[in-house]
Amino acid sequence: MAPSFADVIAVVPAAGIGSRMQTECPKQYLTIGNQTILEHAVAPLLQHPRISRVIIAISPADTAFARLPLAAHPDIQVVRGGAQRADSVLAGLQAAGDARWALVHDAARPCLSAQDLERLLALTETSQVGGILAAPACDTMKRAEPGKPAIAHTVDRENLWHALTPQLFPLELLRDCLTRALAEGATITDEASALEHCGFHPELVAGRADNIKVTRPEDLALAAFYLTRLTPMETA
C-alpha cells in the first residue's frame, strides 16, 4: 500500500550565507527571472501532492524571507536554522510532527525536475533506508597532492557519483543518525553522510545532471539557462 500524503514532509536548510558567490546577500535570495533561487528550489516541492508541508530553516538574522510571497504560503513553515547544515535540518525535523519520511533539498538547487522528484519519492514504497538523487561521474577525476595544486593520481570514476538533492529518508532514522553523527564529531556534508557514518547504505537514484547547486557566480547564468529548458510538465 502506498504511504498517505501526510507521511512525507520536506526540509529546506536555508540559513547559509554562500560566501563563494561573492555577493552581499545570501545566494538563495539571488534572483533568476522574477523569482529567487529559493523560490525556484521550493516550487516543485509545493506542487507535489505527496509532500504535505515544506519546512524552511532560516538564519535568525534573516530579513529577506519575510518579504517573499513564499512566506505567506499555507504549506510553508519557518524554523530557526543552526550554525551548520545538520543543525538546520534537525531543527526542521523537530517541527515535522508525525511524518514518516523526510525529504531534504538544497535551498540553492533551483532546477529540480518533477520526474526526478517522482523517482525519488518512489523509494517510500520499496526502501527501508531511503536514498538520494545522484548523477554518475562523467569527467576524468584527479586527486591532488596534499596541500598543493598538483596531480597525485587519476581516480577510477566507474563507481563514482555526484550527490545531489533532494535526499529522502525515514524521518526517525535521519534524525537519529544526524544526532549521533554530530555527537561523535563526524564530518556531515549531506544527510546521506550521516547515515553512512551510522552504518547504513542509502540508495542511489539516477537524476538529471542539470539539477545543479548554485555555488559560484558562473552557476547563476547556467541555472537560468537550465530553467528555460525545463518544460512546464517537468517543473510542475
From Swiss-Prot:
It catalyses: 2-C-methyl-D-erythritol 4-phosphate + CTP + H(+) = 4-CDP-2-C-methyl-D-erythritol + diphosphate. It comes from the Bacteria. Pfam families: IspD. It is an enzyme of class 2 (transferase). The record marks R20, K27 as: Transition state stabilizer. GO terms for biological process: isopentenyl diphosphate biosynthetic process, methylerythritol 4-phosphate pathway. Its EC number is 2.7.7.60. The keyword Transferase applies. The record marks R157, K213 as: Positions MEP for the nucleophilic attack. SUPFAM superfamilies: Nucleotide-diphospho-sugar transferases (SSF53448). The keyword RNA-binding does not apply. CDD domains: CDP-ME_synthetase. Keywords: Isoprene biosynthesis, Nucleotidyltransferase, Transferase. One of its GO terms (molecular function) is 2-C-methyl-D-erythritol 4-phosphate cytidylyltransferase activity. Pathway: Isoprenoid biosynthesis; isopentenyl diphosphate biosynthesis via DXP pathway; isopentenyl diphosphate from 1-deoxy-D-xylulose 5-phosphate: step 2/6. Signal peptide: none annotated. Catalyzes the formation of 4-diphosphocytidyl-2-C-methyl-D-erythritol from CTP and 2-C-methyl-D-erythritol 4-phosphate (MEP). HAMAP family: IspD. Homodimer. Belongs to the IspD/TarI cytidylyltransferase family. IspD subfamily. This is 2-C-methyl-D-erythritol 4-phosphate cytidylyltransferase. It comes from Cronobacter sakazakii (strain ATCC BAA-894) (Enterobacter sakazakii). The gene is ispD.
